[in-house]
């Protein structure tokens, strides 16, 4: 069984990084990030860059205003950047 943390969508990117580090230190397996106030992929990158083992996923990613190719490239890059944690 895995336990994942969530976060407040109004957090700044600096707060996201601190929250992710805290979740990792507390032993959470992952962090679900929203796609609301900030771009969900950018929020995910902030969390991934701040941690070593925490897995990160978007709770929801609004795809209608985004190019499918850009979403695929960004997801691929986040997966590679994080060593498979996205």
What are these regions (language model features)?
Residues 1-58:
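N-terminal beta1-alpha1-beta2 module of alpha/beta enzyme domains
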């Amino acid at each position: 069984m895995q336990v994942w943390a969530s976060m407040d969508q109004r957090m700044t990117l600096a707060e996201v990084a601190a929250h992710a580090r805290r979740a990792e230190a507390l032993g959470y397996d992952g962090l679900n990030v929203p796609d609301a106030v900030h771009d969900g992929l950018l929020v995910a990158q902030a969390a991934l860059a701040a941690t070593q083992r925490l897995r990160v996923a978007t709770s929801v990613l609004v795809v209608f205003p985004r190019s499918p190719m850009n979403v695929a490239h960004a997801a691929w890059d986040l997966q590679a950047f994080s060593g498979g944690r996205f």
